[in-house]
Amino acid sequence: MKKVVKYLISLILAIIIVLFVQTFVIVGHVIPNNDMSPTLNKGDRVIVNKIKVTFNQLNNGDIITYRRGNEIYTSRIIAKPGQSMAFRQGQLYRDDRPVDASYAKNRKIKDFSLRNFKELDGDIIPPNNFVVLNDHDNNQHDSRQFGLIDKKDIIGNISLRYYPFSKWTIQFKS
């Protein structure tokens, strides 16, 4: 009987730990489309880290998952609170300076800036809001369609691709 009780206690503790980790630390996710191609492709399996969101550690270049209505999307942060941004002639400008990162240059994207966002009255991103962009230029499930992304809608940043095994990746910056 003591063994059964110990087993049940261990099982309950394991379930509590798993629930805690999935709620506050990390969660698995399957990429549902090719919006982030070629960086991430449909069917890739990734780990989403929730800690950076909780502690306000999201950075430009981070690939995040976020909710929009009932859907979950994956995009790259290109500008964060307190910054200005614009895309001109295929080049990302942040705070009026060209960004030197592979995701920011030679893009086949129509020119746009913060002035295109209806919900914004100026040229600076307000607190708790981000501008995101997909790596695949033709897929506009990002700020070009949705506008600013509120921090409360961000699930976390992608910190690891573990499948397919041949594309194992830990670092997704530029």
Curated annotation (Swiss-Prot):
Membrane side Extracellular: residue ranges: 29-174
Highest taxon of source: Bacteria
GO molecular function, one term: serine-type endopeptidase activity
Record-level GO BP terms: signal peptide processing
Cellular component GO terms, alphabetical: plasma membrane
Spans within the Cytoplasmic topological domain: 1-7
Residues that span the membrane, as ranges: 8-28
Entry's localization field: Cell membrane
Principal localisation: membrane
Pfam families: Peptidase_S26
Family that this chain belongs to: Belongs to the peptidase S26 family.
PANTHER family linked: CHLOROPLAST PROCESSING PEPTIDASE, SIGNAL PEPTIDASE I
Protein name: Inactive signal peptidase IA
Gene: spsA
